[in-house]
Amino acid sequence: LGGEPTLDPQVQEVLDEAIRIGRDDIYLDITTNLTNVTDYWLKSLSRFKDVQLQFSIDATGKTNEYIRTTSHWPQIEKNIRRYLNFEIESNTNWMLSFHQTVSIYNIFDFWKLHEWVESLRAEDKFNRIETEFGYHCYVLHSPAELDAKILPLEYRAEILNNFNQYRPNIKQTHEDTGIQSVITLLESNTRPEHADALFEYCKKRTKAVDKVRGHYIKKYIPHWPMP
């Protein structure tokens, strides 16, 4: 099933039926954007023995709200805490992980999400979670006009300089692998074929989308390279 599972009644129906027939041994692998969570949903998940929850978030604050237009960052923070608190209180042992896709919109401060995840890990009450929640980072490749590789080199240099101030905080673990792919992009001196044309198209596309939504990108992403 596609879409946001917490909003799809068919997903809840499947969980309810599995619980009814005693199939709590089913492995659940669920990806959610954290825009919605209910007590009934949490209690349903707690009935299963093997649950993996993947939180799909692209950034923090206003940047995430721009990329995920239906999201509201304070609600996202509230919802992740509901998951974490419920896991502690119900003594479940879910596998939790955050997944970020880096595009031309969020690359300007992509490390802020990792920093936020680290701040959650550092909270005393969440240190009690048996399985530490992970962070995974991926570079977007399609559509081409949103691929961060089309950024002019001067922007890459500025982003890399800003990132290097945070870089020492990243542990040498599997998390470093995903972030390293972004670093490789930023350190590269090459751009894709037709990068200039794609970059101009991206700016025009962004302006057109903003007009439809009634948004202005620089109010959400101040470093965005357009007036």
Language-model features: locations:
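Catalytic cores of alpha/beta
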Residues: 104-121
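PAPS-dependent sulfotransferase catalytic core
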Residues: 142-165
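Conserved, well-structured beta-alpha core segment at the onset of a catalytic domain
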Residues: 88-91, 105
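Acidic (Asp/Glu)-rich catalytic clusters
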Residues: 19, 43-50, 84-89, 121
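Core AdoMet radical
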Residues: 1-9, 21-39, 46-78, 95-104, ...
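Alpha-helical packing segments of well-folded alpha/beta enzyme cores
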Residues: 14, 76-79, 83, 113
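Distinct, well-ordered alpha-helical segments
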Residues: 10-16, 38-45, 109-111
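Radical SAM enzyme core and accessory elements
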Residues: 160-227
